């Protein structure tokens, strides 16, 4: 693992002395917790599905524009619920949630998320987002800044237009909109290979593939269009503790994207997970969970 908070490289076994070992071991030997609970809540006429597990400070998990919440975050629902109330939602147009209306942009997603948190009685929560979920976490901070006590941005962008060269951002949106009109097989075939490193175990990849095959065309289209926005203006104004986590084999959000966010967000901490791709929380769950746990301990001690 590389901890670039101070511009230095640190091996996982050396991170904060023996503390990283203690954190990862805790994931294995922690006290038993209840099975995740599947629930549904209505927000502004939309049925929003989610799973939650554990007790303690709230940790809300936002998935990418492919897959669903429980599949994307299973290892965090299991691995962090000994200490946190972990909530993984299905965004409108994903998983078991209903599709959004037409012209449902990034601000609408952020407002829906704020309404979701309100329905759950969460005045403030640690908010973690993967890829599109990271963009959504930033949009939530921009429109409802009092809802996030800490941000964890994994494989995230300041929107595609805010983090990628213009031609790359435009091509990515064109591809996504074309895939939304195609078959599930074409959708999975085009995107799944870009989500993981070449060393990803087939069994784990197959689980993620199954969730991708159940994609909602309208929801995927809405999330792709929301992902294409530019939220760079927010970054210098972020005033909550922020952790950036990226896989060092990520071909979708490369290190240049990570470093640009670290530079723009004052006091942010950047951790690289070795040999992990875009869905780094799935590919390196123990390292990801350890980094999150340590960050939340440090930022609220």
Describe the residue ranges of each PLM region.
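Gly/Ala-rich beta-loop-alpha elbow adjacent to hydrolase catalytic centers
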Residues: 129, 133, 137
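Short beta-strand/loop motif that positions the catalytic acidic residue
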Residues: 238, 244-246
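Active-site loop/oxyanion-hole signature of alpha/beta-hydrolase fold enzymes
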Residues: 74, 78, 87-128, 290
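Acidic catalytic loop of the alpha/beta-hydrolase fold
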Residues: 248-253
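Catalytic active-site module of serine/aspartate enzymes centered on a nucleophile-bearing elbow/loop
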Residues: 268-301
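Conserved HGGG/HGGXW glycine-rich cap/lid loop of the alpha/beta-hydrolase fold
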Residues: 43-98
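Conserved alpha/beta-hydrolase catalytic His-Asp/Glu region
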Residues: 163-168, 181-236
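Flexible "cap/lid" loop of the alpha/beta hydrolase fold
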Residues: 138, 142-143, 148-180
């Amino acid at each position: 693992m590389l901890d670039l908070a101070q511009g230095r490289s640190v091996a996982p076994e050396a991170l904060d002395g023996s503390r990283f070992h203690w954190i990862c071991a805790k994931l294995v030997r922690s006290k038993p917790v209840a099975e995740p609970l599947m629930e549904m809540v209505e927000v502004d006429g939309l049925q929003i599905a989610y799973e939650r597990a554990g007790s303690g400070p709230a940790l809300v998990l936002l998935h990418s524009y492919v897959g669903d919440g429980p599949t994307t975050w299973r290892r965090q629902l299991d691995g962090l619920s000994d200490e946190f109330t972990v909530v993984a939602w299905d965004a409108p147009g994903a998983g078991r949630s209903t599709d959004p209306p037409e012209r449902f942009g990034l601000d609408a997603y952020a407002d829906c998320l704020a309404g979701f948190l309100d329905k759950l009685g969460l005045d403030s929560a640690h908010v973690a987002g993967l890829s599109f979920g990271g963009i959504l976490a930033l949009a939530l901070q921009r429109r409802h800044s009092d809802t996030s006590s800490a941000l964890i941005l994994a494989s995230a962008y300041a929107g595609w237009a805010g983090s990628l060269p213009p031609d790359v951002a435009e091509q990515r949106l064109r591809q996504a909109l074309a895939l939304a009109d195609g078959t599930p097989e074409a959708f999975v075939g085009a995107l799944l290979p870009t989500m993981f490193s070449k060393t990803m175990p087939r069994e784990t990849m197959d689980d993620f593939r199954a969730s991708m095959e159940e994609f909602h065309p309208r929801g995927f289209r809405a999330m792709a269009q929301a992902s294409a926005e530019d939220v760079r203006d927010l970054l210098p104004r972020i005033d909550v503790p922020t952790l950036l986590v990226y896989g060092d084999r990520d071909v979708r959000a490369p290190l240049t994207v990570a470093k640009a966010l670290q530079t723009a967000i004052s006091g942010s901490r950047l951790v690289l997970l070795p040999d992990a791709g875009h869905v780094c929380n799935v590919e390196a769950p123990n390292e990801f969970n350890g980094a999150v746990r340590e960050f939340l301990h440090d930022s609220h001690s």
